[in-house]
Amino acid sequence: MSNLSSKLFRGNLVIRIAIGLVLGVLLAFISPEWAKSVGVLGQFFVKSLRAIAPILVFVLVLSAIANKEVGTDAKLKPILVMYVLGTFLAALTAVVFSFIFPTRLELVSSPGDLTPPQGIGEIIKTVVFNLVDNPLQALANANFIGILAWAIGLGIPLRYAAPSTKIFLNDLSEAVSYVVKMVISVAPIGVFGLVAETIATNGMNAFIGYARLLGVLLGAMMTVIFVLDPILVYWKIRRNPYPLTFICLRESGLTAFFTRSSAANIPVNMNLAKRLGVRDEIASVAIPLGATINMAGAAITVTVLTLAAAYTQGIYPDFMTALLLSIVASICACGASGVSGGSLLLIPLACSLFNIPNDIAAQVIGVGFIIGVIQDSAETALNSSTDVLFTTAVSQAEDRKES
């Protein structure tokens, strides 16, 4: 028992998380009531991550830009290209899987208090309005687009500030990073609570009726994770991409799978990027930006569920129409973080391409909520792990050129 306690509280973080995961599963099967009770540990962990993430991003970006080194802008451009390309290829992969495995839905009612966006213009409007949000509201509401805008806006003039100001900002950044390390250190306990509550509440039989739909979704996501993303990484680093891919999956994807929040996983990704040698001035901008626009998982969800809705209505789109859907899904996915409800609420917008009525599209959202425990977890794991994967790959490629 003392050996187990040592591993759980002082050992390697990944091993500790794995132990917490296994213990959570066991508790859910042994005593579901107790498992639901310990769910508060998981809720506390997620709330802690969400609480620290906005101030972490603001302080780190502000400090990084104020102390910015020459050449950072050149490194951000290829990272943005990777984000956009990865999201589009993910949507295209979802189209291919949906064509090979066409899926019909058992439609149910969706929650009545949800209001999906009415068009791409509304999504763009949301993003632009978030960009000029009040800085205090942006921090309070975890509006990362607004936080980035204010941090960059203040950071640029602070590059000309006195050295003492830059030292203060750097010290403040170190202090926030220390708090983040403290929060991450309790990740095994948080994962234990999240897993125990999830399995005790939903059970393993809740997803059988939607096994085919989940199979298409997860198959597309796995293809992106283990085939397309490594190809993109190899394009940058020109060596075996899988060691880096597996590190990012193990240390970022696993946590994101259970927190189901890209924003909450930002501190985890920042910590991992630092250990992988990514400079702070790169990671502090690229990682939060990735949590906002790098949405491969969301693009897959929107594409698969939209095509499933089309098949259910007897609509069989040709490949060019599906290609257009991929482009629309990619654009929509980039705005998913700016829409309450995430990728599921963007489905009616994509369904409008096929003239699918809004009431049918709303029922597709209901299906999304049924499978959401698995779908949202896998989607977030893909989204968040590729943030740090692409950032690290570009950083290593640029460092190799400079050496």
UniProtKB/Swiss-Prot annotation:
UniProt entry tagged with the keyword Transport: yes
Membrane spanning residue stretches: 11-31, 51-71, 81-101, 138-158, 175-195, 213-233, 285-305, 319-339
GO BP annotation list: serine transport; threonine transport
HAMAP family found in the cross-reference section: Ser_Thr_transp_SstT (MF_01582)
One Pfam entry name: SDF
Catalysed reactions, as listed in the record: L-serine(in) + Na(+)(in) = L-serine(out) + Na(+)(out); L-threonine(in) + Na(+)(in) = L-threonine(out) + Na(+)(out)
Superkingdom, natural source: Bacteria
UniProt gene name: sstT
Function: Involved in the import of serine and threonine into the cell, with the concomitant import of sodium (symport system).
Family classification: Belongs to the dicarboxylate/amino acid:cation symporter (DAACS) (TC 2.A.23) family.
Record organism: Haemophilus ducreyi (strain 35000HP / ATCC 700724)
Bilayer disposition of the protein: Multi-pass membrane protein
Cellular component, GO annotation: plasma membrane
Name the record gives this protein: Serine/threonine transporter SstT
GO molecular function, one term: neutral L-amino acid:sodium symporter activity
InterPro entries: Na-dicarboxylate_symporter (IPR001991), Na:dicarbo_symporter_sf (IPR036458), Ser_Thr_transp_SstT (IPR023025)
Location in or out of the cell: Cell inner membrane
Keywords: Amino-acid transport, Cell inner membrane, Cell membrane, Membrane, Symport, Transmembrane, Transmembrane helix, Transport
Keyword Transmembrane tagged: yes
